[in-house]
């Protein structure tokens, strides 16, 4: 009787390291991975098809729910594609606000990735550290949109509203004494820009804390150095983008190579790795957090000095202001028509891509002249990255497969769509 050497193991979909609903069928020789077969589709919600039955504005909130860790970056790509079709100019202040919140979103994403990736590899402390900073970033989301996650803040032609002049404050309660309350509200006395500036000033110290815990940690290096190595040419051939591509040594960043909004005016560097392993991708993302913080500082300085409109004055696309709507019946009718019937987009097609925290996130829109898209195609970076898992995991131990899944920073909202 022949000896059975290899056996199959189901990893997920209810596994804490699966980062969502990944079902991974692993063929193992002992603890060594011989083949990894990802099964996707467990979070499929037909977003692309739904968009064909919704007006252009009604489709916007669906974008938040694709990669639900990088909400506004998804909206950004959708709005850019729609503005291309409409030939719609965006006010300069709105562009700066978009870039500001795109980088805030990058920090949100990378903090989530760092905490969960380290937790998967056995360092649960990192999760507590990173979520401490994420709370402040969510407060920024809440201040402009009223929602802590699914903001729907970016709009075709600009953003929903200007930055508020005050920050919400913590109220007195039985669980906080006056001293604790004063400490919580210390940096909330001014405007949202003051709050963001305060965060940007202290955030580099937080990143230093993360690096103290991980960068030279012997166990962390043993779990990541030499794991999941991808050569530069192979990374290109596999369709990798974002930190996955830059970790292999290729300095491709859409904010530099194909700048959109006001990224050409921003001063920042593009970090790249050398060996293309999990450790290099970790270093790239950590440095990206520092660079994103630099961009946030530049946006805050410009926005303080330059007031102006934050959405286009094209009333066929932009909704009237609340004050006008409450005092003028025509404005109220216009608002109602815009949000029920929507606006018609000229016939044509457009592709817009942004440097999403996970890679190149693209939206391909086809219009037939109606108030709904004829076709909406989403180019999700995680889809291409997950397809490389089999190649990256072969020959590694099963515990290393967890580190490789973590380094990909995958979210199934965008992969399954």
UniProtKB/Swiss-Prot annotation:
Its main location: membrane. It catalyses: a quinone + NADH + 5 H(+)(in) = a quinol + NAD(+) + 4 H(+)(out). It is an enzyme of class 7 (translocase). Its EC number is 7.1.1.-. Keywords: Cell inner membrane, Cell membrane, Membrane, NAD, Quinone, Translocase, Transport, Ubiquinone. SUPFAM superfamilies: HydB/Nqo4-like. It is a peripheral membrane protein. It comes from the Bacteria. InterPro entries: NADH_Q_OxRdtase_suD (IPR001135), NADH_UbQ_OxRdtase_49kDa_CS (IPR014029), NDH1_su_D/H (IPR022885), NiFe-Hase_large (IPR029014). GO terms for cellular component: plasma membrane. Belongs to the complex I 49 kDa subunit family. PANTHER family: NADH DEHYDROGENASE [UBIQUINONE] IRON-SULFUR PROTEIN 2, MITOCHONDRIAL (PTHR11993:SF10), NADH-UBIQUINONE OXIDOREDUCTASE 49 KDA SUBUNIT (PTHR11993). NDH-1 is composed of 14 different subunits. Subunits NuoB, C, D, E, F, and G constitute the peripheral sector of the complex. This is NADH-quinone oxidoreductase subunit D. It comes from Verminephrobacter eiseniae (strain EF01-2). The gene is nuoD.
């Amino acid at each position: 009787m022949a000896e059975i050497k290899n056996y199959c193991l189901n990893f997920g979909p209810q596994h804490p390291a699966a980062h969502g609903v990944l079902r991974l069928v692993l063929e193992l020789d002992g603890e060594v991975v011989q083949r990894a077969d990802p099964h996707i589709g467990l979070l499929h919600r037909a977003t692309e098809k739904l968009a064909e039955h919704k007006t252009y504005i009604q489709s916007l909130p669906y974008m938040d729910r694709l990669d639900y860790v990088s909400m506004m970056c998804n909206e950004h790509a959708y709005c850019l594609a729609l503005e291309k079709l409409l030939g719609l100019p965006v006010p300069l202040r709105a562009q700066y606000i978009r870039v500001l919140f795109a980088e805030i979103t990058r920090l949100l994403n990378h903090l989530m990735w760092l905490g969960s990736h380290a937790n998967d590899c056995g360092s649960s402390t990192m999760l507590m550290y990173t979520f401490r900073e994420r709370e402040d970033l969510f407060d920024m989301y809440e201040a402009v949109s009223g929602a802590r996650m699914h903001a729907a803040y970016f709009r075709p032609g600009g953003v929903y509203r200007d930055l508020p002049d005050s920050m919400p404050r913590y109220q007195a309660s039985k669980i906080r004494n006056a001293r604790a309350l004063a400490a919580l509200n210390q940096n909330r006395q001014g405007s949202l820009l003051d709050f963001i500036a305060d965060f940007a000033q202290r955030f580099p110290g937080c990143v230093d804390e993360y690096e103290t815990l991980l960068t030279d940690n012997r166990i962390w290096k043993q779990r990541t150095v030499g794991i999941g190595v991808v050569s530069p040419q192979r990374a290109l051939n596999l369709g990798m983008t974002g930190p996955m591509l830059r970790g292999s040594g290729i300095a491709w960043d859409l904010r530099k190579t194909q700048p959109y909004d006001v990224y050409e005016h921003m001063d920042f560097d593009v970090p790249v790795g050398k060996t293309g392993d999990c450790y290099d991708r970790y270093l790239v993302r950590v440095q990206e957090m520092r660079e994103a913080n630099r961009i946030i500082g530049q946006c805050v300085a410009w926005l303080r000095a330059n007031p102006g409109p934050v959405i286009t004055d094209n009333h066929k696309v932009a909704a009237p202001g609340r004050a006008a709507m409450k005092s003028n019946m025509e404005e109220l009718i216009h608002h109602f028509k815009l949000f029920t019937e929507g606006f018609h987009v000229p016939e044509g097609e457009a592709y817009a891509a942004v440097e999403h925290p996970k890679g190149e996130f693209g939206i391909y829109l086809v219009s037939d002249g109606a108030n709904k898209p004829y076709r909406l195609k989403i180019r999700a970076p995680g889809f291409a990255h997950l397809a490389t898992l089999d190649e990256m995991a072969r020959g590694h131990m099963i515990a290393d497969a967890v580190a490789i899944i973590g380094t990909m920073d995958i979210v199934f909202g965008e992969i399954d769509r």
